[in-house]
Design a protein with these regions (language model features):
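N-terminal low-complexity, Pro/Thr/Ser-rich intrinsically disordered segments
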Residues: 29-48
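Acidic Gly/Asp/Thr-rich repetitive segments characteristic of extracellular carbohydrate-active
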Residues: 47-78
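Bacterial N-terminal signal peptides that target proteins for export
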Residues: 2-11
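Acidic, glycine- and Ser/Thr-rich low-complexity intrinsically disordered tracts
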Residues: 27, 31, 346-431
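Extracellular beta-strand-rich solenoid/capping regions of secreted or surface-exposed proteins
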Residues: 63-71, 82-97, 104-151, 165-168, ...
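Right-handed parallel beta-helix
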Residues: 98-103, 119-130, 149-160, 172-186, ...
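Short glycine/acidic-rich loop motifs that flank beta-strands on beta-rich extracellular proteins
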Residues: 73, 85-87, 106-112, 132-138, ...
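Bacterial N-terminal signal peptides
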Residues: 12-21
Length: 431
């Protein structure tokens, strides 16, 4: 997907040619592959790159520095501004790229990503300034493209870009933690192509052109994405799309997030879509989220039609959405319904949710095709502080819908030793 160069050189020779120095003190790094963490491995010293003083395009030099890394080594970007005229690829396994205080400035909307191809690699601390006035759909137009296994993207700031901010394309055992994504023309964070065991935690996403966080499983992927934990993120404002969405996928948990200011769609959507030929969605937990200011007139973008979706919307086309638990969420200021089930949506529990200032039905039951007692169950929901009746007659409710969501024991451990508090050089606190 990304053009790469095959030139290689010894570390010392590259240091002279590229103007970067080798740190005098070795680091304790992680050699992580296939989800296995090996801490404090003996590795080569840090390699350090510096921005060109004249502001010239540095992409070729940076790619040579990346290619020269040894397994387990870290490349440190010294603080400053780096002009990068094409995409970069991290190909070596078990290396770390650290850039706290460094900004990479893209100049080509079609070719501006950092592809994290090597297994067990880490990208931490960089600020990526994107470019683009027209929305694009290619991996090379994203800002970070995760294709390897055991990849972690930590504390990266993405400002602008023609496509998605962070694009997880088939990666496994991936951690997307502590990042800030703003003003991309497509999704903020997008997980697809059969990605497995993905942690999306503690990120801030603002003002995107489409979904702020999305898990999408297309039939052409060959397998649905699964075991995804979306937790503790702060999301606000997008021109189109939803806040958090699972459109096809299995074993997903959406918990403890704040979702605000979604202008045209649902705050949280779990769906199967015919128009995009997606897989069904099943075994999804939606718990303890705050969902507010959804499709309000004052925030609507001119020329963008509102979808009429609920604040938390579960819907299916010709496929199915099954086994969804919507529990203990706070839903405030939604123009349409609070929670809705639409189409072939069965095995849903809606319990313990607090709803206020809802413009439509608090719980809209529009499911079809479900067996008796298998459409919706639940209790203890409130509207404006007043208890709501159960979403189905007690006698018709199924005894239990088995919904577990993501298996958190299979999530990757975050490489905290590679993180810093911005501007202070100290280790970050685990999110």
């Amino acid at each position: 997907m990304i053009p790469t160069r095959k030139s290689r050189c010894a570390l010392a020779a590259c240091a002279v040619a590229l103007g970067f120095r080798v740190a005098a003190v070795s680091q304790d790094a992680a050699a992580t592959a296939a989800g296995m963490q090996v801490e404090h491995a003996t590795v080569a010293p840090d390699a350090i790159v510096h921005p060109f003083a004249d502001g010239a395009d540095q992409a070729d030099a940076l790619q040579r520095a990346l290619d020269a890394l040894q397994r387990g080594q870290r490349l440190v970007f010294a603080p400053g501004r780096y002009v990068v005229g094409r995409s970069l690829a991290v190909k070596q396994a078990n290396v770390a790229i650290s850039g706290y205080g460094a900004t990479l400035i893209a100049t080509d909307p079609d070719d501006q990503t950092i592809e994290m191809r090597g297994d067990g690699t880490t990208l931490a601390g960089l600020t990526l300034a994107g470019i683009g006035a027209t929305r694009l759909t290619t991996p090379a137009s994203t800002k970070v493209d995760v294709t390897g296994r055991g990849v972690q993207v930590l504390d990266v700031v993405i400002d602008g870009g023609a496509s998605a901010g962070i694009f997880v394309f088939g990666g496994q055992d991936v951690a997307i933690v502590g990042n800030e994504v703003r003003a991309t023309l497509a999704d903020g964070i997008h997980v697809t192509h059969g990605a497995l065991n993905v942690l999306v935690q503690g990120n801030v996403v603002r003002d995107t052109g489409d979904d702020m966080i999305a898990v999408v499983s297309y039939r052409n992927d060959g397998a649905p994405s699964g075991n995804v934990l979306i937790a503790g993120n702060s999301l606000e404002g997008n021109d189109w799309g939803r806040g958090v969405t699972v459109v096809g996928g299995a074993d997903v948990t959406i918990a403890d997030n704040i979702v605000r200011g979604v202008r045209t769609g649902a705050g949280i959507l779990v769906a199967q879509e015919d128009s995009y030929r997606t897989y069904d969605a099943t075994n999804v937990r939606v718990a303890r989220n705050v969902v507010a200011d959804i499709q309000q007139r004052a925030s609507r973008q001119a020329g963008r039609a509102q979808t009429g979706q609920a604040a938390i919307d579960l819907n299916a086309g010709s496929g199915a959405v099954t086994r969804v638990d919507v529990t203990d969420n706070r839903i405030v200021d939604a123009r349409f319904a609070g929670v809705r089930t639409l189409g072939n949506v069965c095995g849903v529990r809606v319990s313990g949710n607090r709803l206020d200032a809802i413009g439509g039905a608090p719980i809209a039951r529009e499911s079809r095709g479900c067996a008796a007692g298998q459409a919706i169950a639940g209790a203890a929901n409130t509207l404006n502080g007043v208890a709501l009746p159960p979403p189905a007659r007690v006698g018709s409710q199924a005894v239990a819908f088995a919904v577990s969501g993501a298996d958190e024991t299979r999530m990757p451990r975050v490489r905290q030793w590679l993180r810093q508090v911005r501007g202070r050089g100290a280790l970050a606190v685990e999110r």
